[in-house]
Amino acid sequence: LEITFAGETTIVPFYKRNRYAITKMKGIPFEYVRTYDFQTTQNASLFDKISLSAEEKYIVEALHIIDPDIEKLNFLNDDLQKRRIPYVTLKGKEKRHRLSSMGDGINRVLTIILALLNCKGGILLLDEFETGLHHSIQIRLWKIIFMLSEKLNIQVFVTSHSQDCINSFVEANNKQKGKLIRLENRNGNVV
C-alpha cells in the first residue's frame, strides 16, 4: 500500500517484511498511530511542537471526552523511566495525576489528538481507531477528529474491524465530510 501526493511523491511506503516500517517524506506533515500506541514516547515531542499554540486547547478538550474534570496537561520528567510523561491537574484538586493512572482509553485519546494536531496540512494514519476506547465515547472523538481535520486541512485514514466504531463514524459524519470504504478478501482478491 502506498499513499501518493499530487500523483508523484510517495508519502508512506509499506513493506511486506515490516508492516510498521514507514518512511516520512520531508515537507508533508504526517503521523501514524499504531494499534498499540497508548503511551508512546513520542507524545512529549508532539506536545512540545504545539505547546503554547492556538491548537493546544484542543488537547484538554479531547481529554474531556473521558474526564471533564481535567484542567491542564503537561509532560514532566520521570527520573525512574528517564523520559517525560503526561500529568494532568483536576478541578478542585491540587495534586498532579499521572495520565497513565487514568486508564488506557484516555492515553489513547491523547496519542490520537497529539498526532492529529501535528498533521496540519498533511495526513494522519490511525490503525484500529477503537482500541482502548469504550464505544460510548467514540462518537465524541470522531466529532473532534472531523472538526479538527477540516479546520487544519488534514486528511485522515482510519482502519477498524469494529461495528461500534463504524456506527459512531456514520453518526458523527453529519456534514458528509468522511467516506467509509469496506475492503474484503474474496478468493484472494481485495474488493
Regions found by a protein language model. Give the residues of each.
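Phosphate-coordinating catalytic segments in nucleotide- and nucleic-acid-processing enzymes
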Residues: 1-111, 175-191
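The start of beta-strands in P-loop NTPase/AAA+ ATPase cores
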Residues: 95, 122-123
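Phosphate-binding glycine-rich loops of NTP-binding sites
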Residues: 103-115, 159, 164
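A short, proline-enriched helix->beta-strand linker immediately N-terminal to the Walker B motif
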Residues: 116-122
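Walker B catalytic acidic pair
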Residues: 127-129
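Catalytic P-loop NTPase motifs of RecA-like helicase/translocase cores
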Residues: 132-133, 166
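C-terminal lobe/lid and adjacent interdomain/linker elements of RecA-like ASCE P-loop ATPase modules
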Residues: 143-191
